[in-house]
C-alpha cells in the first residue's frame, strides 16, 4: 500500500520513499503501511491544485454539475459503508457501531453540500446611485489546505472536503499521519465519482513538514485545521506571512451543567456518554461536570457506579462499549494529567489506572476516571485532557454556574440539564460557546454550524455557513448609463 499519495490525478509514492506503519491501537498489530510524504510532496500537490483551479475546469462547472459529483461521492460512501467502518475501527480502535454511524453521517454531509452547490445565485442589492445595478456574488476562494485530526479521521475530513468541492475550490488534504486509511479510501471514491485531475490532492505526512508547507505556501488561499490548540497557534503564525484565510477548530473543555430539577436518571446516563464516548477522545466531550450542590452526592454515587461497569474491549465485539486510546504517547499524556489531578487535591472516585484484564494488555486502554472535589484553579479543569477523565464541581446558583462554565480559555460546546426550560434558555444565552445543548449532549448534524468561541478557534464548519467559509464575496457594480465625470476640466 505504498502508493498512498494522490497528486494531480495519480496515486504515487513519496519522493523520498519513506514508509509509515499504521497500527491497531487495540493490539498494536500492523494493519497497513503507507507512503510518508514530506515538504517536497506538499509543494507538488499545491502546484497541482493551483493549476487545476486556475484552469477552471472545476470552478467553471455549474453548481448543479458539481453537486452531482459530490452527491455521487455520498452514494459511493454508502455503497462501501461496511468497508469504511471496518477500516476506521481498525485505525482508531473505536467500536464498529460508532464507525458505522460516522460513515452514515459522512455520507449525509456530502449529500447536504451537494444540495447546496447550486443554491447561491448571488444577491441583487438596491443601489443608492441612479442608473446603476449592484449585485453580491460568492466565488470559490481557490486552493484550500486541509488538516484533520486522528480522533474522527473521515468525519472531520468530510466537513472540509464536501463544502470546499461544492463551492468550486481545489484542495490539498493532510490527514493525521497515524489514522489515514479511510481518507485514502475516500479519495479513491472521489476519483471514481469523477472529480477532475488535480482538484483533490492527498499528501500523508507529519505536520512539521507537510502541514507547515500548507500554511506557509503562497499558492494556498485558505487553510482549515482541526486539532490541538498549540498546533493551531503554530499554523496561525506560519500563515500570517502571506495573510491567507484561516479556519481553526481547536478543541474544548466543555461544561455539562446539571440542575437539581433535571431528570437525574437521564442526566447521569448522558453525562457518561458525554465524557466516556470514544474514550473521551472527542473535542466536544463533556469533561467538566457541574452539578448543583443539593444533588451532588446522589448524582456522583450513581455516576461512579455506572462508570465502573463500562465495558472496555475490542471495537469489533458487540459487547464493547469503549475502545482504547489512540497511542502509547497519548495514554502517557492522560496518565500524567491524572497524576496532576491527584497532586492538585482532586479526589479520585474511580479509574485512574490501566485495566487489569489480560485481554487488554496489548492495547492502549485506560479506565474511565472520575475526579470529585475539583475547582477552576486546577489544571485538570482548565486543560483539555482528551481522554476518559471527568472532573466534578458543584454550584449553588445560576450566576455561579455561568461563571464556572465560562471560566476556561475554551468555548466550543456545553450542555444544560433542567426541567425548567426558561432557566435552560437563560443559562444557554450566557454561555460563551459555539454550541449549547439543552437536555441533551453531543448531537450535531450537517445543517447546523459547528465551531467555537475564544481559543476553541474561529470559523465554522457544517451548515450553510460552512460552505460560505470556502468562498470570497465580490461586489459587482454596473453603470447602466455611462457618462463622462468631467472632474478634471483640462
Curated annotation (Swiss-Prot):
Enzyme Commission number: 1.2.1.8
Positions of disulphide bridges: none
pH dependence: Optimum pH is 8.0.
One Pfam family named in its UniProt record: Aldedh
One of the GO biological process terms: glycine betaine biosynthetic process from choline
Phenotypic consequence of gene deletion: Deletion of the gbsAB genes abolishes the choline-glycine betaine synthesis pathway and the ability of B.subtilis to deal effectively with high-osmolarity stress in choline- or glycine betaine aldehyde-containing medium. No effect on vanillin degradation.
Molecular function GO labels: betaine-aldehyde dehydrogenase (NAD+) activity; metal ion binding
Residue ranges that the Swiss-Prot or TrEMBL entry lists as coiled coil: none
Keyword Kinase: no
Catalytic activity: betaine aldehyde + NAD(+) + H2O = glycine betaine + NADH + 2 H(+)
Keyword Coiled coil found: no
Pathway as given in its UniProt record: Amine and polyamine biosynthesis; betaine biosynthesis via choline pathway; betaine from betaine aldehyde: step 1/1
Activity regulation (UniProt): Activity is stimulated by low concentrations of salts and by moderate concentrations of glycine betaine. Highly tolerant to high ionic conditions. In vitro, activity is highly stimulated in the presence of proline.
Amino acids binding NAD(+): 174, 177, 227-232, 384
Signal peptide stretch: none
Highest taxon in the source lineage: Bacteria
Cited CDD domains: ALDH_BADH-GbsA
UniProtKB keywords: NAD, Oxidoreductase
Major enzyme class: oxidoreductase
Family: Belongs to the aldehyde dehydrogenase family.
The protein's role, per its UniProt record: Involved in the biosynthesis of the osmoprotectant glycine betaine from choline. Catalyzes the oxidation of betaine aldehyde to betaine. Shows specificity for betaine aldehyde as substrate. Can use both NAD(+) and NADP(+), but NAD(+) is strongly preferred.
The protein's assembly and partners: Homodimer.
Name of the molecule in the record: Betaine aldehyde dehydrogenase
Species this chain originates from: Bacillus subtilis (strain 168)
Chain's gene name: gbsA
Amino acid at each position: 500500500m505504498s502508493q498512498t499519495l494522490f497528486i494531480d490525478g495519480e496515486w504515487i509514492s513519496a519522493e523520498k520513499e519513506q514508509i509509515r506503519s499504521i497500527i491497531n491501537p487495540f493490539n498494536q498489530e500492523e494493519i497497513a503501511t503507507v507512503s510518508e510524504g514530506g515538504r517536497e510532496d506538499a509543494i507538488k500537490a499545491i502546484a497541482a491544485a493551483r493549476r487545476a483551479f486556475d484552469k477552471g475546469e472545476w470552478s467553471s462547472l455549474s453548481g448543479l454539475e458539481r453537486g452531482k459529483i459530490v452527491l455521487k461521492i455520498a452514494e459511493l460512501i454508502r455503497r462501501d459503508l461496511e468497508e469504511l467502518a471496518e477500516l476506521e475501527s481498525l485505525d482508531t480502535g473505536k467500536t464498529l457501531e460508532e464507525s458505522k454511524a460516522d460513515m452514515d453521517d459522512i455520507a449525509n454531509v456530502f449529500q447536504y453540500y451537494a444540495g447546496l452547490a447550486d443554491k447561491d445565485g448571488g444577491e441583487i442589492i438596491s443601489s443608492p446611485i441612479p442608473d446603476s445595478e449592484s449585485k453580491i456574488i460568492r466565488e470559490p476562494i481557490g486552493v484550500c489546505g486541509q488538516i484533520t485530526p486522528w480522533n474522527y479521521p473521515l468525519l472531520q475530513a468530510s466537513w472540509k472536503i464536501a463544502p470546499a468541492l461544492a463551492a468550486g475550490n481545489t484542495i490539498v488534504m493532510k490527514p493525521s499521519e497515524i489514522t489515514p486509511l479511510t481518507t485514502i479510501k475516500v479519495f479513491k471514491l472521489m476519483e471514481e465519482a469523477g472529480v477532475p485531475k488535480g482538484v483533490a490532492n492527498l499528501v500523508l505526512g507529519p505536520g512539521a513538514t507537510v502541514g507547515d508547507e500548507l500554511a506557509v505556501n503562497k499558492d494556498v488561499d485558505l487553510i482549515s485545521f482541526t486539532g490541538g490548540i498549540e498546533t493551531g497557534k503554530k499554523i496561525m503564525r506560519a500563515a500570517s506571512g502571506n495573510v491567507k484565510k484561516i479556519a481553526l477548530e481547536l478543541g474544548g473543555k466543555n461544561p455539562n451543567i446539571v440542575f437539581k430539577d433535571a431528570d437525574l436518571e437521564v442526566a447521569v446516563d448522558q453525562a457518561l456518554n458525554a465524557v466516556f464516548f470514544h474514550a473521551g477522545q472527542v473535542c466536544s466531550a463533556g469533561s467538566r461536570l457541574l452539578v448543583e450542590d443539593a444533588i451532588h452526592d446522589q448524582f456522583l454515587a450513581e455516576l461512579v457506579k455506572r462508570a465502573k461497569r463500562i465495558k472496555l474491549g475490542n471495537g469489533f465485539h458487540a459487547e464493547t462499549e469503549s475502545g482504547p486510546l489512540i497511542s502509547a504517547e497519548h495514554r502517557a499524556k492522560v496518565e500524567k494529567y491524572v497524576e496532576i489531578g491527584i497532586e492538585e487535591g482532586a479526589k479520585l472516585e474511580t479509574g485512574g489506572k490501566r485495566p487489569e484484564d489480560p485481554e487488554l494488555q496489548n492495547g492502549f486502554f485506560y479506565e474511565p476516571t472520575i475526579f470529585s472535589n475539583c475547582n477552576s484553579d486546577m489544571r485538570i479543569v482548565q486543560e483539555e485532557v482528551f481522554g476518559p477523565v471527568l472532573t466534578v464541581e458543584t454550584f449553588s446558583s445560576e450566576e455561579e454556574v455561568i461563571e464556572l462554565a465560562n471560566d476556561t480559555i475554551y468555548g466550543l460546546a456545553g450542555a444544560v440539564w433542567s426541567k425548567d426550560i426558561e432557566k435552560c434558555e437563560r443559562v444557554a444565552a450566557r454561555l460563551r460557546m459555539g454550541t449549547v445543548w439543552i437536555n441533551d449532549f453531543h448531537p450535531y448534524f450537517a445543517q447546523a454550524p459547528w465551531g467555537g468561541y475564544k481559543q476553541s478557534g474561529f470559523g465554522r464548519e457544517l451548515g450553510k455557513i460552512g460552505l460560505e467559509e470556502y468562498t470570497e464575496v465580490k461586489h459587482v457594480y454596473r453603470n447602466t448609463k455611462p457618462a463622462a465625470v468631467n472632474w478634471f476640466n483640462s
